[in-house]
Amino acid sequence: MNQASDEKALVVLSGGQDSTTCLYWALRRFGAGKVEAVTFDYGQRHRVELDCARKIAALAGVRQTVLPIDTFAAIGGNALTDASIAPEEGVRDDDALPNTFVPGRNLVFLTFAAAFAYTRGARHLVTGVAQTDYSGYPDCRENTLKALEVALRLGMDSRVELHTPLMYLSKAETVTLAQQVGALEALAWSHTCYNGEVPPCGHCASCELRAKGFAEAGVPDPLVERCQAEAQGL
C-alpha cells in the first residue's frame, strides 16, 4: 500500500469560484505547506480560467501544476469544449442536462488527480463539486464521488480520501464559507463565465448563479468590483 501522508492535500483548482473557495478551505484544514493544486487544460472554451488558476495559486502561496488533457476537445459534443456549440443562457427549469455538461470530466479529472497525488505522497483530494443549486451534473453527485473514492482506493491500493466541502451548500452558503476561510480577495481573480468573458457576460447559467449567490449572501462580488474599478481606471 502507498504510504501517503495523512496531512498532505491536493486541490483540483479550475480558477473558478468553487475551487478557489476549496483551496482556501484546504489551507485552513491542512495548513500552509501541506497543500498543492492541480489544474487541467482540457481545451475549455473559457481559457481565461487557466490564467486565473495560476494567479490564485500564487496569491495563496501554493505550488500549482497544469496537466494537459486534450481528449475532451477531441470528443466534443458540449458547449465547453466545442466552439460550434454556444452555451445555453440562463438556468434551466427542467431535469435535462445543460449543454455545458462534459461527460466524464470530473471522473477523469479526479482519477488523474489521484494518480498525481499518489506520486506526491498526498492522501487527500479536494474538489469543489456540489449537487445543490443547479446543473444536476451526474459526476457532481455524492454517490458518484463515493463510488469513485472506493474505485481509486482499490485501483491504487491507497487510502485516498475525497473531500467535497461544498457538496450540500447553496451558492450563498459557498460565499459565506469563502468569507470564513479568507478567500474573498482571491475570488476577485476567479472566473466563472461559460463564455470566457471578463467582465463576466452576466447571462449564462454560471454567471446567473454566481450573481444570485453573492446577492443572497449580501456580499459584493469581488470580481465585479475589480472589473468596475479597472474600467474606471482605478
UniProtKB/Swiss-Prot annotation:
Q: Which reactions is this enzyme annotated as catalysing? A: 7-carboxy-7-deazaguanine + NH4(+) + ATP = 7-cyano-7-deazaguanine + ADP + phosphate + H2O + H(+)
Q: What is this protein called?
A: 7-cyano-7-deazaguanine synthase
The residues that the entry says bind ATP are: 13-23
Supply the source organism for this entry: Chromobacterium violaceum (strain ATCC 12472 / DSM 30191 / JCM 1249 / CCUG 213 / NBRC 12614 / NCIMB 9131 / NCTC 9757 / MK)
Q: What is its EC number?
A: 6.3.4.20
State what this protein does. Catalyzes the ATP-dependent conversion of 7-carboxy-7-deazaguanine (CDG) to 7-cyano-7-deazaguanine (preQ(0)).
Gene behind this protein: queC
Enzyme class name: ligase
Q: How does the cofactor attach, per the note? A: Binds 1 zinc ion per subunit.
Q: Which family does it belong to?
A: Belongs to the QueC family.
**What SUPFAM superfamilies would the database entry show?**
Adenine nucleotide alpha hydrolases-like (SSF52402)
Question: Is Nucleus tagged as a keyword?
Answer: no
